[in-house]
Amino acid sequence: VPGKGNGRITIKDATKKFFKLHSESELAKDKAFINFGPQLLKALAASERFQGAYLLNYVDDTDIEREIQFAAIEIDTSDGTPFISYRGTDDRIIGWKEDFNLSYMTVPAEIEAVLYLQDVMSGRKENFRLGGHSKGGHLAIYAASKATQDLAERAVNIYSFDGPGFGFNRDILNSTQFKKIQPRIEKFIPQTSVVGRLLTRTVAPVI
């Protein structure tokens, strides 16, 4: 997937390139808890709704010394409303350490989430949506709460899929900007949710 400012590619074409690089037998050996990702990608590529969506502005920043694990991507859909997607934690220790840190301090991924949103969407006029799973959902809410007023107003929806609430940064929940975006936050958690129930919640979740 192209990085920031380096063009775009459809989900269908990205899937073709991915499976040229990685065989089914190779992927079957992957024991990571997110190893279902390639099969989900294949399903999206076969979907009339999603196969033509464009992927662009991808960033992936993982650094042990800085204690950061951050990734985000813009997805352009047919309705003309870009979706900014923040990735959650994978099975690397550095990501889990950052998760624990966000319970009592501002973490680098939160800062990067704001900078990414402002870098990608500033200077444009269209409305957009943003969201993510687990830590990604937390980052989406944080970014919308801390971005410029113009961006906050253009955020149509903020989605958190089983994302944690706020600990150290729970003062955000009392900020004027958060209160303005709060009606546009939609949080979803499974019945067996653990992470999505942690820390101070932002809105009542849909189970």
Region roles according to the model:
Residues 1-82, 86-103, 107-127, 148-207:
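Alpha/beta hydrolase fold serine-hydrolase catalytic domain that processes acyl esters and thioesters
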